[in-house]
A protein has these predicted regions:
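Conserved beta-strand in the GNAT
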Residues: 53, 59-68
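A short beta-loop-alpha structural element at the N-terminal edge
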Residues: 3-17
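Glycine-rich acetyl-CoA-binding "A-motif" of GNAT/NAT acetyltransferases
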Residues: 48, 59-62, 125
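Conserved beta-strand-loop-alpha-helix junction that forms the acyl-donor binding cleft
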Residues: 113-126, 144-149
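Conserved GNAT-fold acetyl-CoA-binding loop/helix
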Residues: 16-41
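Conserved GNAT acetyl-CoA-binding A-motif
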Residues: 100, 107-118
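A short helix-loop-beta-strand connector motif used in the catalytic cores of GNAT acetyltransferases and
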Residues: 41-53, 80
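Conserved acetyl-CoA-binding loop-helix of GNAT-fold acetyltransferases
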Residues: 86, 92-105, 132
Length: 160
């Protein structure tokens, strides 16, 4: 039985609290109100994708966000694991693997042909999990250009 379920508005406080810690770990600026707005957008608009939460009893201990898109290269619908986070207290219990299974099942049901994700280079455990689950590095760059002004948006670091 899955420990994941579709997120609802009542889960936003827990998701945002976890997100804040995760962003701080990686040195990104975090704005609570922006995170809440984004979470509610994904919860309330199924055309954007899905947000799932992992629960231990009544407590949210993780989440995975899947955003939908389109690609000629991937012959139609594609999706992106925008975020996958498991609380440190619950890591090593198979929840990351289960989060990917939930995301993949949702994507197959939604007619998605390819599922993408990005991972911080220093997160070796996550890289290992993703590779074991069949994700491959296509030796490409993920590049971003912000189209809306934001003082708080994550910014790339200089590469060496």
């Amino acid at each position: 039985m899955s420990r994941f379920r579709r997120a609802g508005p009542g889960d936003v406080d827990a998701i945002v609290a976890m997100m804040c810690g995760y962003y701080q770990e990686d040195g990104y600026t975090f704005v609570d109100s922006e995170a809440r707005t984004a979470a509610l957008m994904l919860i309330n608009d199924p055309s954007l994708g899905r947000l799932f939460v992992a629960c231990d009893g009544a407590h949210v201990v993780g989440y995975v966000a899947v955003a939908l898109g389109f690609s000629f290269e991937y012959r139609g619908r594609e999706a992106f694991v925008d975020e996958l986070l498991i609380a440190e207290s619950h890591r090593g219990r198979g929840l990351g693997r289960e989060a990917l299974e939930v995301a993949e099942t949702y994507c197959r049901e939604a007619g998605v042909n390819a599922l993408h994700l990005e991972v911080e280079r220093h997160r070796e455990n996550a890289l290992d999990l993703y590779r074991r689950r069949g994700f491959a590095d296509f030796n490409r760059y993920l590049m971003t250009k912000w189209l809306t002004p934001s003082k708080t948006a994550p910014r790339p670091t200089a590469s060496t």
